[in-house]
Each structure stands twice: as C-alpha cells, then as structure tokens.
Regions:
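Active-site and donor-binding regions of nucleotide-sugar-utilizing enzymes
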Residues: 2-37, 42-164
Length: 164
C-alpha cells in the first residue's frame, strides 16, 4: 500500500461543500458540481495522510469505533483488518475536521466508503454506480450506502431488500 504523509495544517481546507472520495472518475463528478459549491478530492491511491493536531485528537476520540473481533473486510487476516479499520477511522476523522455537506464517489463498491457511510450518518454519502452488478448472491453484509445513483430498476428493487 502506497502512502503519502503531509503535516502542514494549511493543507486542510475546512468547510468544503463536497468531498469527492477517490480520484477515479473525479473529473466526471467535478463536471456536474455547480460552480457555487466548493469541492476537494480525497485521494486514496496512494492513501494520503494529513497530520494535524485536530485530526490527531479526533482520531483518538474515534478509536472507539474499532471492533477487534468483527470482520469488516473479506479475505484479510486479523491484523490487516485492524489496520484497515484504523485507516477508516483516520478518514472519518479527516472528514469530520473538513465538515463537508456531502461525500460523493463513483466507486460504489468501495469497502472504505461503505464503512464511512455506515459510521457517519450526519453527512450524506452518495455513490454513483460504476458497473453492472450481475449477482447479489455474494455476502455483502459489509456493504452500506446511504444514497446510490444506479443504472436501473433491478438495483432500485433489490437495494432495500438487502438492507444496505
């Protein structure tokens, strides 16, 4: 996993209207955001860490969200799962400091986005479907999305049944 570390407090823009989660297809999302809204891209490839005192304090407070024996990601060992949760908690802390009005992604099946959507109910998380889902047979109990813009009626009918 590639990472990038920043420590300058000036690099955090507070009170951004929209965070685009992941740079994949971010240009498409930027094209539909009205000019009256500010936005920034939260890059996940490589993961960017911005370290400031407010983020560290929020991170410590949010450590209560770590679930030691709950499996949030599939096919990962115990320690990878804990590190993955820690990463999600860091991103949650970052988002809480920035205070966006919404978080949008085109990676609708991203497990980090799903975790954040489930654990941050006070901010709308919006996913735009990026692919055709042929089967719901897999265990998707880890998936959660507050708002999904999708391709057709199949998802509209099945999404609520799966309690996502």
């Amino acid at each position: 996993m590639k990472t990038s570390l920043k420590s300058a407090p000036s690099q955090i823009k507070k009170s951004i209207d929209i965070i685009i989660f992941d740079e994949t297809n971010s240009q498409l999302i930027m094209n539909i955001i009205p000019d009256t809204y500010s936005y920034s891209i939260y890059k996940t490839r490589p993961v960017e860490f911005t370290i400031t005192l407010p983020i560290i304090l929020r991170l410590i407070f949010n450590l209560k969200d770590i679930k030691i024996f709950e499996q949030f990601t599939t096919n990962k060992g115990f320690f990878k799962n804990i590190l993955w949760q820690f990463l999600c908690i860091y991103i949650k802390s970052y988002i809480q400091i920035v205070k966006p009005k919404a978080v949008i992604t085109s990676i609708d099946n991203c497990t980090k986005f799903a975790w954040l959507s489930k654990h941050m109910q006070d901010i709308p998380f919006i996913a735009i479907q990026n692919g055709f889902r042929l089967s719901y047979a897999l265990d998707n109990s880890l998936y959660h999305c507050q708002h999904l813009f999708c391709f057709g009626d199949f998802e509209v009918e099945n999404f609520p049944k799966r309690e996502w």
